[in-house]
């Protein structure tokens, strides 16, 4: 459509880049239809949970102070528990981010002398300090919790033999990171996670299994809690917040595990009874309601990105045809210059701070300089269109988000345009 092409041209996208994108898009009709089918199922699942728990306007009332008898907060946790098919849920704006939620879950369920096992290799950068892999005050290691790790096999599969040897009487909790994080391994499917949980529990039935579910919610019709996870943990400024939640995190799981998490978050004896919602309930409810369709938009953007960059010779994880289990698309660009150009394109497509110039910086919690592009309405929201990555080989940029598919499309086209303008790509 000439009118659309002119609008893109006015925003700095050349006809060559636009036409290259349209050719890629023409191949994706069935992939997009499949994504929409999953979104439709998950949308119905969320609505059913809200109806079952009789969500009403009364749930949107603000509370302050202690937050005793907070109807909206307590009911939202019932909705989450029903959607994730768990006994209980802790969904709070007092949880500041995904790393905080994971820290609460680990600290609540591990005691001095216990052992934590990761059977999927090194955890995400920020969690390394939480555990004590990298020294930090108040880490689990400082409190006497031991850590053991089993790396993935070279083909990215689980090392079942190594895991069997690693599980011992002191193994209290097993942590499984669903998403790739800043690695280039594949993200695990719910089915794969279920098989791993079954294997671990066949060796030690009472072991607690926690899944870091960040970036994975609503990408499939099932969640890790459907296949045996004792806790699933995530951030409300990622998938389940639907782009509307301004802060927050969640922990869904068994009554025992979640109850301990509540005591860790607030205080022993207080647990889930305190924690005012501060007027955030409308955003948290509506964001969760919108989340399945927002996640679908983000996933379409990831698929589109792989189908643009892979034919140009860049390694994409997942590749252009693989099934997807989170919203992250990794593209190995081979150089710092490529990462900067890509991120400048994402930033230039943003509705907020589009004029900003992303550059690598020393971000707290990371060992390497990190570049981030995110013109977001909620600071740090990675369900909104964003791209980031550590400045280290293989110089992979991690693209995720897009509250609407059309914004995700614009961002990817703009990233390619900046690569072309920098002389890093020829179409």
Model-found features: residue ranges?
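N-terminal small-domain helix-loop-helix segment of the aminotransferase-like
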Residues: 64-72, 76
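Conserved PLP-enzyme active-site core in the AAT-like
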Residues: 4-29, 46-52, 56-59, 67-70, ...
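Short glycine-rich or small-residue beta-strand-to-loop segments that form or flank ligand, phosphate
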Residues: 59, 63-64, 90-93, 327-332
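ATP-dependent carbohydrate kinase catalytic cores
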Residues: 75-78, 83
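Acidic, PIN/NYN-like endoribonuclease modules and their adjacent C-terminal/linker elements
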Residues: 39-43
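Short N-terminal edge-element motif at the start of the domain
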Residues: 31-35
């Amino acid at each position: 459509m000439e009118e659309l092409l002119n609008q893109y041209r006015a925003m700095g996208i050349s006809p060559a880049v636009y036409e290259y994108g349209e050719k890629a898009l023409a191949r994706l009709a069935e992939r997009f239809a499949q994504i929409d089918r999953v979104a439709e199922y998950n949308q119905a699942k969320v609505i059913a949970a809200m109806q079952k728990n009789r969500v009403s306007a009364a749930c949107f009332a603000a509370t302050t102070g202690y937050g005793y008898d907070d109807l909206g907060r307590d009911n939202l946790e019932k909705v989450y528990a029903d959607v994730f098919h768990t006994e209980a849920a802790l969904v709070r704006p007092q949880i500041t981010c995904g790393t905080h939620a994971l820290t609460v879950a680990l600290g609540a369920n591990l005691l001095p002398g216990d052992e934590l096992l990761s059977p999927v290799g090194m955890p995400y950068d920020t969690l390394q300090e939480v555990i004590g892999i990298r020294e930090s005050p108040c880490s689990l290691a400082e409190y006497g919790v031991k850590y053991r790790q089993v790396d993935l096999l070279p083909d990215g599969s689980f090392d079942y033999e190594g895991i069997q040897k690693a599980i011992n009487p002191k193994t209290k909790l097993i942590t499984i990171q669903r998403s790739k994080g800043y690695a280039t391994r594949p993200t695990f499917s719910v089915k794969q996670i279920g098989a791993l949980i079954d294997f671990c529990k066949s060796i030690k039935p009472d072991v607690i299994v926690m899944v870091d579910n960040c970036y994975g919610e609503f990408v499939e019709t099932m969640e890790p809690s459907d296949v045996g996870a004792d806790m699933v943990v995530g951030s409300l400024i990622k998938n389940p917040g639907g782009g509307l939640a301004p802060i927050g995190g969640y922990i869904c799981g068994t009554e025992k595990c979640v109850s301990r998490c509540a005591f860790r978050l607030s205080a022993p004896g207080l647990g889930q009874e305190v924690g005012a919602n501060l007027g955030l309930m409308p955003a948290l409810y509506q964001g969760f309601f919108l989340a399945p369709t927002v996640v679908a938009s983000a996933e379409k953007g990831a698929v589109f990105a792989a189908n643009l960059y892979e034919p140009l010779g860049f390694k994409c994880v997942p590749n252009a045809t693989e099934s997807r289990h989170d919203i992250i698309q990794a593209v190995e660009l081979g150089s710092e210059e490529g990462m900067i150009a890509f991120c400048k394109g994402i930033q230039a497509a943003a509705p907020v701070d589009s004029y900003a110039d992303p550059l690598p910086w020393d971000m707290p919690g990371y060992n390497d300089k990190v570049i981030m592009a995110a013109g977001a309405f909620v600071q740090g929201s990675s369900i909104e269109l964003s791209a980031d990555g550590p400045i280290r080989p293989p110089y992979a940029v991690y693209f995720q988000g897009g509250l609407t598919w059309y914004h995700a499309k614009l961002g990817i086209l703009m990233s390619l345009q900046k690569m072309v303008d920098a002389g890093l790509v020829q179409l």
